[in-house]
Amino acid sequence: MPLSWNEIKDRALRFSREWAEETAEDAEAKSFWDGFFEVFGVSRRRVASFEQPVKRGDGKDGYIDLLWKGILLVEHKSRGKNLDRAFKQATDYFPGLKERDLPKYVLVSDFARLRLHDLESGEQHEVALAELHQHVALFGFIAGYQVRVFKDQDPANIRAAERMGELHDALRQSGYEGHELEVLLVRLLFCLFAEDTGIFERRQFQDFLEQRTADDGSDLGARLAELFHALNTPREKRQRTLDESIAAFEYVNGALFREPLPPAAFTRAQREALLNACSMDWSRISPAIFGALFQSIMDAKARRNLGAHYTSEKNILKLIGPLFMDGLRAEFERVKGNRKALNQFHEKIAALTFLDPACGCGNFLVIAYRELRALEHDILQALYRKELDGGQVLDPRQLILCNVDKFYGIEIEEFPAQIAQVAMWLTDHQMNLRVQEQFGNRFVRLPLTHSATIVHGNALRMDWNEVVPAARLNYILGNPPFIGAKMMSEQNRADLLAVAGKLKGAGLLDFVSAWYLKAAEYIQSRHSRESGNPAALATEGLDSRFRGNDDIRCAFVSTNSITQGEQVGVLWGEMLRLGVCIFFAHRTFSWNNEARGVAAVHCVIVGFARQDISPKRLFDYETVKSEPHEIVAANINPYLVDAANMLLSSRREPIGRVPQIAFGNMPNDGGNLLLSDEEKHVLLQAEPDAARWIRSFLGAHEFINSTPRWCLWLRDIPPAELRNLPLVARRVAAVKGLRQESSRATTRELAAYPALFGEIRQPIERYILVPRHSSESRAYIPFGFVDPHVICGDSNMLVPSSDLAHFGMMQSSMHMAWLRTVGGRLKSDYRYSAGIVYNNFPWPEIAGPSTPAAGAAYAQGERSRGAIEAAAQAVL
């Protein structure tokens, strides 16, 4: 067990005085370092060796003054010698060491000075021997104290995940797979963290592997089984003749090591892979994202299919802050000067309960718990500042109230659920290390008696009250799977319909919508006292301090499509019916992934509850990658706009007397009826008579970028003429074959008309072409008048029978603002639609020759029309 910091400081002061006058390297260096390790309560003989033989970089034999494998290399010189040269000499030994034995620190000394090089951070610190007691925290890694600051995309997270991935692949290829492999890896993951963060002794697990298992790996599986059994057995119940290296391990409990596993048959290479994983400094690894990285490396395809997107901590904090942490931090500032109120606040935060119903590897729960513990840390500093300043030693076990057992998760995949469970324990321990640093006493919660509740199951098919009764819950959070309505598997769709099947238009919904609806129904159940709901009734007996808010507060990360286009009316119509109010939201931004092939998805965050919470906070972004700026809103509606709640359903007809809008012509041809410039040239050289059947073709890309493209427009072509154009006929035959092989019955029917586009809506008069998708960077979507001879592709919409005034209204800033507000998006690009954008737009009445109004009204209409036409002409 590590010494308290106060004890270490006392020992350091005595050590400095004892060695203040020593000068000769050879005479007393070994005694010096034995004493140095004793300062931190560690026996040098147990962890490090003197005069370690090694091949230097130049091929010559050398001897390392002191080596603690994988941790520390010491080079010692006589007083006054050059420490830069000592460091250079130390690094010259590196080529002769195994990779897993390479040190994380190099310490050089001349008795009077100690210079520590942190090789992973690149930092260097020099301490005078006489001042060692003032800087003992620099050497906390020796005693087992080590607090890390985690960084997004730290390469250490990637390396650690890849090393575990290598071990996973090697074992799976040998036939050890499935549930047993997943449990084994989670246990190994715990052991790796444990020996680098003070749960186990430093290098205890690695030394066991190196010293108590055969080099060829033949007995490694059996030895691990022995170790796992011991970790699940209290010390007093272990066999007295147990191998001392196993008996020395702490009792862990927590069900982590309870299940018996068939021993894996390791090879030499697999043993080396595990030892290589041991060589990482696991104290640097963030449990918040490691599990996600680990899972993605093991099975990237499965991860994509589940729609999971693992995220940076910065983005997770965008949800956690406005959901609960910002409010708790503000409350802490209000009460921190009042000891009684502060104690009550401490009890309040310890009682808060959280659920992530799509928790994956637990990253949202982990960071929520970490932030709550960080707040508790500040509370304890405020409560016990006088005692700490006076050097009084306090027992953190009596002071820490927050624990992982207030955190719940549901995860459909077994392996991520197991990782989430362990990640919560590891985060708890890492926060306990901060308490150690603050109070000077070791704080390790072993055996594990409390744990997060992570349920392996389908959240859309279960009653969440069976996981945690709504009466006990304060917050729901997470990022359910990002799967669009058209990308769902049959199972995804069945799960969605199990929740939303009664809603008209449920087929339009993205998968994430099911979690919104499920959460809204769940929090409503808390209020159903009149129906005899036990969860709701149970609330009556709770102390008001522990009841939290009357309503559970929820927040999900979601694809931005749930706040745009057709989905809004379907999803939010039901959400509003269930009494939900949005109290904070992040508008569209780029949600980055920490895993391989970093995925960026355009997302929103929506916070909602059944009570009307103020102030309402709306976070907007200048671009999807910029930092947000906050707006205090009077109301946040389902389009994430500061305006009254309104819902637009898809309309078949436009409002007002304006032309109908339609989709362009869909070839459904596999590209056989479309021609590039070069293909057109080649065809006309061979068959010049085909020229009368070739038309200019405009898809959205061609229209926006002025790119020439052509199509075969074979309406009314006589069969005899087609036979005289063999190259054209060959293309038509290819269309027929493609359509005949389609899985869609309607497409197979089109095989009877292979010379024609699959869907034809080409007008006979000039029309307005409207690209269906356009970049968000444009202030105006580029519409344009097009001659009827030019074929409009189905990546556009078209408005026939249009005049200049109607074109002017479509290009107006008012119409563009309408599109940006209610239209759908592809990522963050605009999506123009008939049913939502065009047909719901409140077109103004503009008098004209075809609709003359009487008297002054007619004259005013003509003036308006003239102004709009002039503006439209300027655009053209």
Task: Enumerate the predicted regions with their spans.
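Preference for the N-terminal adenyl/adenosyl cofactor-binding alpha/beta module
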Residues: 2-16, 129, 133-371, 406, ...
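A short, conserved, highly charged catalytic patch centered on acidic carboxylates
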Residues: 1-105, 119-122, 755, 762
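Short, hydrophobic/amphipathic alpha-helical patches that form generic packing surfaces
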Residues: 34-38, 186-195, 292-296, 422-429, ...
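Polybasic, glycine- and aromatic-enriched phosphate-binding surface used to engage nucleic acids
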Residues: 78, 95, 614, 622-874
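Intrinsic disorder/low-complexity segments
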Residues: 525-551, 847-869
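Signature of N6-adenine DNA methyltransferases within the class I
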Residues: 22, 56-62, 83, 87-89, ...
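Glycine- and acidic
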Residues: 13-21, 75-77, 149-152, 168-175, ...
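Flexible phosphate/Mg2+-sensing switch loops adjacent to catalytic phosphate-binding sites
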Residues: 47-50, 204-208, 331-350, 372-405, ...
